[in-house]
């Protein structure tokens, strides 16, 4: 009886998760696409410079004139050559400028690849990940659902292996790990290959905007002499838990960030008021200095 109930619970979750990641919970016409761009020159409009390719399929690519993005996104990181780093969820529609001979793309969600991933392999596919509810006393534990985007197919895996902690200095591993497995819309898309229960990610695509929620406003504390305001940083890169901390002895070394990343710091409670440094992707919103 208990075994059958667990099987029913797992099956129900699985069906829900496949529906969620396929985009059919929004509109049946919504699919995930990789974007490409070429700076072609045309003598007569319209002049579509973008193409989209439906993920995990062999369908023919489509030419796109314009993208219609949701409000609140920094479009300078999304258009032109930058668009080659995007995955978009949405649907095509007739162009507002040339309805009879051009196509626009109405974007529901947009994801951008983290710089300095690994070179993609011929076996890589695109996945999103969920928790299947399995709990184990030993590891590895097969508790991760890897759902193939645009395809009603999935695999159960035990490990998500990211390349970025090796490739990028001072990356916030808590921030990245929090995006691997989510129950909301804000999880990452992983391009990778599954073997023996492990997916080796070549590139991760981050949901935009990031963070997806507004950081909380913090009170301004009055600290006694010899103390200063310090913080922690949560999985959304927001400063939290302000407190007065006695000054510590700080090192003077300041790290350099890899290309595509910017240096940020904050007075850390963990480091007794000394600055804690991270290298955040340049395309995410700043949450502090």
Swiss-Prot record:
Covalent S-S links between cysteines: none
Matching InterPro entries: DDB_G0275255-like
Subcellular location: Secreted
Signal peptide (residue range): 1-23
Glycosylation sites: 74, 101, 132, 285
A GO CC term attached to the entry: extracellular region
Keywords in alphabetical order: Glycoprotein, Secreted, Signal
Protein name: Uncharacterized protein DDB_G0275255
UniProt source species: Dictyostelium discoideum (Social amoeba)
Source lineage: Eukaryota, Amoebozoa, Evosea, Eumycetozoa, Dictyostelia
